Amino acid sequence: MNAWEVNFDGLVGLTHHYAGLSFGNEASTRHRFQVSNPRLAAKQGLLKMKKLADAGFPQAVIPPHERPFIPVLRQLGFSGSDEQVLEKVARQAPHWLSSVSSASPMWVANAATIAPSADTLDGKVHLTVANLNNKFHRSLEAPVTESLLKAIFNDEEKFSVHSALPQVALLGDEGAANHNRLGGHYGEPGMQLFVYGREEGNDTRPSRYPARQTREASEAVARLNQVNPQQVIFAQQNPDVIDQGVFHNDVIAVSNRQVLFCHQQAFARQSQLLANLRARVNGFMAIEVPATQVSVSDAVSTYLFNSQLLSRDDGSMVLVLPQECREHAGVWRYLNELLAADNPISELKVFDLRESMANGGGPACLRLRVVLTEEERRAVNPAVMMNDTLFNALNDWVDRYYRDRLTAADLADPQLLREGREALDTLTQLLDLGSVYPFQREGGGNG
């Protein structure tokens, strides 16, 4: 059956700031306390969506979350009106204010793990929300992510959206950033590759930085998504590269159809994994980048592998890269050699995503891949699909509500909270989502 990969990109939120919240993510730590530009960040993301849509790659948008997230501050013991809560936390414990104001939901590669209908036992598309258990600021995302996905994939005959796994370290799940799918045409059954960093009873694990994904979580997600057990492989990421800042697999590998583009040090027991994939995926091609050409350190600093690998109708592929790759002489030299070599990659598209990159999120972090048949695509909420009208409407919306300068101190401004709620109220109408945010459901309006 014919099917297409639709990229659902996260829209950067109004409180995008640099707080260094993500230990193990070296870009996040390095840019801590810099001044951010939320308006520019949102526009950089929108431009990527629009240019890819114009190039023929189906594209949609997932909205940001409500931030600062006052309900969690109340759970932490701050009381009074919303304004009083903000004032108290800013004075007494500003680190909590930064955490509940994080715009991290924009990295929707961590929103959920997807199983296309061709891979599932019941023939539905399955989406399991990630619990993002390893980082407090990200663990707050799951309930609203679930509401948003249910508003976008709202036809229960075609889509099953599952709640996140329990919030315990044993079941730490980071979503599609640790998941690849390999195979032929998108509509054919594919091989799902789940990548984990640690498992109970296995001493092979990183020592410097945390392994965020567990094998136990990956196995549970595969069960929830009803993936045919014959179409699943579980593989461990190389713990040494996690200790070098590869906090998700999508920082060291990316797949599309029959191609796996990865660093030669990406996986534990890599040669064994690739042999398994060759045996189980027709036409499988591994493009392994040698450390002699691109070091792990350079891969992390340029986000070479946090790229998007997209298929054209003729079978050729486009690699979507951040500008940092072009600015690194060694990485750019390698990429031009890759273009000239015998493989399906025939074009490089480069985007300026500096605002997101400075927090450790490249092109692949910003998108959630969902393979859909034509019938399934028609069942998606049409208001989120990117086109000229939506692009212009969202740019106008960003111009109206977003600030062009934000520091950690600005997060205590009650006006920022009001602006954010008014903006999201408007956005839910624009995207025909209904009341998906807690402040809307509580009848709090814009106050």
From Swiss-Prot:
Record keyword Glycosyltransferase present: no
Protein family: Belongs to the succinylarginine dihydrolase family.
InterPro entries: AstB_sf (IPR037031), SuccinylArg_d-Hdrlase_AstB (IPR007079)
Gene3D superfamilies in UniProt: Succinylarginine dihydrolase
One annotated GO biological process: arginine catabolic process to succinate
Active site: E174, H248, C365
Protein name, per record: N-succinylarginine dihydrolase
Keywords: Arginine metabolism, Hydrolase
The organism's place on the tree of life at top rank: Bacteria
Pathway(s) it belongs to: Amino-acid degradation; L-arginine degradation via AST pathway; L-glutamate and succinate from L-arginine: step 2/5
Top enzyme class: hydrolase
Organism name: Escherichia coli O81 (strain ED1a)
Entry's EC annotation: 3.5.3.23
Quaternary state and interactors: Homodimer.
Keyword Cell wall biogenesis/degradation: no
Function: Catalyzes the hydrolysis of N(2)-succinylarginine into N(2)-succinylornithine, ammonia and CO(2).
Reactions accelerated catalytically: N(2)-succinyl-L-arginine + 2 H2O + 2 H(+) = N(2)-succinyl-L-ornithine + 2 NH4(+) + CO2
UniProt GO MF annotations: N-succinylarginine dihydrolase activity
NCBIfam families according to UniProt: arg_catab_astB, PRK13281.1
Residues annotated to bind substrate: 19-28, 110, 137-138, 212, 250, 359
